[in-house]
Amino acid sequence: MTRLDANFIPNLNDGISSERVVFRGNNYRITVLSERLLRLEYNPNGHFSDYLTTLVANRNFSVPAFKVEQDDKYLMITTNYFMLQYIKNKSFVGPKFAPDNNLRVTLLNTDKSWFYGQAEARNFKGGASSLDDFDGSVKLDKGLYSTDGFVMIDDSNNLEIDASGGLISPDKDKVDLYLFMYKRDFGLCLKDYFTLTGYPELIPRYALGIWWNKERIYSSEDTKLLIKAFNRNKIPISVLLLSEFWHIKDKTNYNLYKTGFSFNKDLFPNPSEFTTYMHERGIRVGLNIDPSEGVRKEEDRYKFISDELLITDGVTIPFNVLDKNFMSLYVKHLIDPLLSLGVDIFWIDYKKDLNVLNGIDYYYNKDFTKVINNRPLILTRSPLVAPHKWGILYSGQTPVSWNTLKFLPFYNSLAANKGVTWWSHDVGGYKGGIEDSELYIRYVQFSCFSPIFRFSAERGVYYKREPWMWDIKTFTIAREFCLLRQRLIPYLYTEACNYSKLGRPLIQPIYYSYPEIYDEPNYKNEYFFGKE
């Protein structure tokens, strides 16, 4: 059996809180992590886990100030922010006529209290997994910001990280909640959140430049011509993303096989030469990865994996993020060879189960920690669970429309409610709709003042994302804002450093400073772009 490298092994002490802040009974365990943060666990079988999860990176907080009163039946914990009242060993779910009977947490000096199952209707939301096929509305996930002054995050069903660094399923009977009770101190709530989940990594400086992607069948020579066109038109480019056609395909039908891990040698006969060519020109290379179809026998490293798994009949090896042996082979034989070839960015385009997506993002990011001479990162759909940890988020294949563009500034500002900065949207929209020079220009202008600036569109000559493909007026304006984006990179990188060290998002909604204007439509699409 293949083992994961040492960089995967977690520090188990990070998952254990001081005994001074833990209160437990046969079926419950309550932990006071900070003056504003509680961990609430209930399990009818009495089992409680200290393993870290895809959400939680640390529970070893400094011991906060609090007061506890308890007897055989009741537990009451008070801090400067809240008072918890609990009937010991009772289910967190109270009776229908009094849902807060068993467990209630009250914000001090307010009329507001939380109980398990509460709707939290005043939550300001924090984003979605993707905006694929956006039609003017989308179901938004809960954020941290709430005019109630509290929010609960449920960690019950998230994957756990065992002592080897592999992922395992959680106990299906457990309830494992994190309750933030912060009143109006949202900045301190974010600090607690990042202490719990991990502070954001500092993204590479190149990621703040201009990205290019088009869903077309590029060859190595095609990409060189593309870069020459950017240079000829005096438009900077920092990242080249290749869609699924970079990898081995069925030669009779290029639309088959969304999954692949080996370069198509007909298009890229020398992958290392291709990445070197780009790196010498200051351009980083990203590849589209969707592992959902498994590992086919045509892959360069198939035999290494199949031999280890004792597979002899050439069948496709299914992808299983919970199979530690398979995932260790996946890392060793599918991720690492691409890193060795000079690939900088892995565009995780997995569209199914969010828990699996979380696991995929975990394995890639953890593997990157052993890389010394490069700073690889992932571009991923949001797994919703602590998405700030996983690099840069990709909002999916958005429609070409004014409705989409109108929604995106509001969507950017929502991200801060979940501690997220690095959202990436398709400049111009990705698919459908009607191409319009005015719409294109407005997208470019918006993207200049967005976290990530990424041109992207599906196949077909109909979609013009190259600024030089438009009329001279559109081209001139688009180039002007591309150059402005380039000049903004030092400012953006300073803000990226502040985000990584201090947890201060690049984009913040106006209502953080002026909460009374939240419902004013004139301000809905406005946000602060950095501290200045």
Regions found by a protein language model. Give the residues of each.
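Carbohydrate-binding surfaces of carbohydrate-active enzymes
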Residues: T2-R24, T31, A229, N233-K234, ...
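A low-complexity, Ser/Thr/Gly/Pro-enriched, surface-exposed linker/loop concept
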Residues: F8, L33-D72
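Beta-sheet entry/capping signal
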Residues: R29, L37-L38, Y74-M76, M83, ...
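Catalytic and substrate-binding clefts that recognize carbohydrates or anionic sugar/phosphate headgroups
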Residues: S62, V68-A207, N213-E215, S220-D222, ...
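Generic, well-ordered alpha-helical scaffold segments in large soluble proteins
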Residues: D192, L196, L226-A229, N233, ...
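Aromatic-lined carbohydrate-binding/catalytic grooves of carbohydrate-active enzymes
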Residues: E201-L354, H388-K389
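Aromatic-lined carbohydrate-recognition surfaces of secreted/lumenal glycan-active proteins
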Residues: W211-N213, L242, I283-R296, I348-K352, ...
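Glycan-recognition surfaces
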Residues: D300-H333, L339, Y363-M469, K501, ...
